[in-house]
Amino acid sequence: MESEQLFHRGYYRNSYNSITSASSDEELLDGAGVIMDFQTSEDDNLLDGDTAVGTHYTMTNGGSINSSTHLLDLLDEPIPGVGTYDDFHTIDWVREKCKDRERHRRINSKKKESAWEMTKSLYDAWSGWLVVTLTGLASGALAGLIDIAADWMTDLKEGICLSALWYNHEQCCWGSNETTFEERDKCPQWKTWAELIIGQAEGPGSYIMNYIMYIFWALSFAFLAVSLVKVFAPYACGSGIPEIKTILSGFIIRGYLGKWTLMIKTVTLVLAVASGLSLGKEGPLVHVACCCGNIFSYLFPKYSTNEAKKREVLSAASAAGVSVAFGAPIGGVLFSLEEVSYYFPLKTLWRSFFAALVAAFVLRSINPFGNSRLVLFYVEYHTPWYLFELFPFILLGVFGGLWGAFFIRANIAWCRRRKSTKFGKYPVLEVIIVAAITAVIAFPNPYTRLNTSELIKELFTDCGPLESSSLCDYRNDMNASKIVDDIPDRPAGIGVYSAIWQLCLALIFKIIMTVFTFGIKVPSGLFIPSMAYYHHDWFIFKEWCEVGADCITPGLYAMVGAAACLGGVTRMTVSLVVIVFELTGGLEYIVPLMAAVMTSKWVGDAFGREGIYEAHIRLNGYPFLDAKEEFTHTTLAADVMRPRRNDPPLAVLTQDNMTVDDIENMINETSYNGFPVIMSKESQRLVGFALRRDLTIAIESARKKQEGIVGSSRVCFAQHTPSLPAESPRPLKLRSILDMSPFTVTDHTPMEIVVDIFRKLGLRQCLVTHNGRLLGIITKKDILRHMAQTANQDPASIMFN
């Protein structure tokens, strides 16, 4: 009965281990246990026929139905190490899904045997919810810690609280009775460095001393951050999102989500934000959350032994990261679905939602900003928007798309130059230079002196009677009978005009410095604040606004501009709109946000479809097939497969004609990560596929544990050992590590279909046959090289080293 069920599921009785030991260097998504074979027929008798190749697509899982070997017999004595992956290789999604299905079947068959087995079954069923709960708790706690520490260290550049050293500037003045409404940030307990060192609070000497101390602390924080990254955790640099996208697609980067990376990333993210560099903490918080998810997954065997299941946890963790970065749990789930996840089943959607909920709850409990909100720059707008405002919103979208296209090209050009010149060999010096330039230019301008979150808060917040910002410096006519908060109908004061000039300079400064900052060897996120300015005397608004009415909300324009710029850089759409309206609590502004974000995406796509994360993936040469890219060229599988003309023949193994020495020599003389197995050199009939790593481990294990295995022992991949002379050494059976259902296509299959299959199934390689005879192999790297050639790029320059 069991074998019949397995057959209907698409697995033949002896093919389990073949599926659980598939190939190695490229990439694989969920095949759901079904392998598509583009052959004329699966009947062996038809393989010799002249049926038109590539015209009849069949679904098969290979293998032999007549096998007498039971599926579970192959699992009685598994070879240690077989089925694991080397660093910088890609997982086999089909094998991992089969392993998980077999584990689940085994647990279900035993759970009625005893109370202990039932308890183990319940623990296994709930382990997914437990791991995402722990991930959410840790992500929220670390985000709160990072926010509090970054605020304190940012204020440390300007001064210190004498009454309590651990208070930042705002907290220091909370309990002071000497604070006035106009100068709410000044109190006796808070001392600037000029007051402490030279005893002057005002004057040129005070300004110069504060300037020097600001630069000193900025350089100290930047130097400490880059030194910690370089010495202890090189993977802690950058945003982390390009690598996480690659890891979620199945690539193995050992240590990238480890405990050292988590510790150093948490500490250096605080230092990098406090140093005043033009970067944010949003992307690195996703990396931090994924590190938590990876570490906690090792506590549960269901996830620690299965790379595909582990990536479901990482998808949920990335949702928790965005949830605490922006205070947007639903936006986090959509971000994970839209931007980073390669495989996102419905169960992962629910767990991502729960992880984002837990993380947001923990951060709200910590309340790091003292405003009972998840982020510093939470704002609420109650003024409705008007139809004529759609035009300036769309203009903001155009600006965002142009800015995004410019930023991606400029940043990638600089990063490529960094890689190809000597400058890239001195990351510490680069960080120090960028930090020094940023600090020297930023200090004189109050808007560039603020960190990113405070700047966004300043721009998003609407003017009211309690606001002391110079952006709200409107003249107040004491003789008028108007209400005090009727700001839009008052003329602008000197503070507003000076603030606009400072904001213009801040915008230019941020544009230039962000290009050079994103990608340096410190944790660096990307959140581009934009600015928008309205004055009620502008002709475009004057005809529409009634006298005395709150017609335009300047903070709303800043919010839409920020969303448009971030959309132009990342090419996010749905998740970005949800994140921004969760930030502002304004459901009525969804239409302006959608208009601006879609416009920015369209304008950006006109210059190139890649977002900043995809561009960095391509720059680093990771084997990532982006589903957003279109392949429109009319080539065939035979044009891309290896070996090409004038190449040496394909390295293959025969079913039962090779010795242990022959296989070891082939492994030593080649660098391939797997070898097709054929019946014989004459027939070239395909039998299966064996991984280099599995062959090496299996032979070493056999030499240690089995007597009589020597270099001249015959290696047999067939079910039945061929008859050998009596004096021959004991044969070595390696059928258990053979993938007897490798993915195959015919030589006339269009490459458009092959690329689509690689994307949707996450394949790492497929074999090319003609009437059942092996012709060659196509790996994921071959496809990436071919796509680079068709785009007139150098294929050798895009591969990961």
From Swiss-Prot:
The chain crosses the membrane at residues 126-163, 209-232, 258-276, 282-301, 349-367, 391-416, 423-443, 500-520, 589-607. A motif (Selectivity filter part_3) lies at residues 525-529. Residues 1-125, 608-801 are cytoplasmic. Residues 641-705, 738-795 form the CBS domain. The record marks 339 as: Mediates proton transfer from the protein to the inner aqueous phase. It is a multi-pass membrane protein. A motif (Selectivity filter part_1) lies at residues 238-242. The record marks 282 as: Mediates proton transfer from the outer aqueous phase to the interior of the protein. Residues 241-248, 313-325, 329-337, 555-569, 573-584, 585-588 dip into the membrane without crossing it. It is found in: Early endosome membrane; Late endosome membrane; Lysosome membrane; Cell membrane. A motif (Di-leucine internalization motif) lies at residues 28-29, 46-47, 71-75. Monomer and homodimer. Forms heterodimers with CLCN4. PANTHER family: CHLORIDE CHANNEL PROTEIN (PTHR45711), H(+)_CL(-) EXCHANGE TRANSPORTER 3 (PTHR45711:SF8). Strongly outwardly rectifying, electrogenic H(+)/Cl(-)exchanger which mediates the exchange of chloride ions against protons. The CLC channel family contains both chloride channels and proton-coupled anion transporters that exchange chloride or another anion for protons. The presence of conserved gating glutamate residues is typical for family members that function as antiporters. This is H(+)/Cl(-) exchange transporter 3.
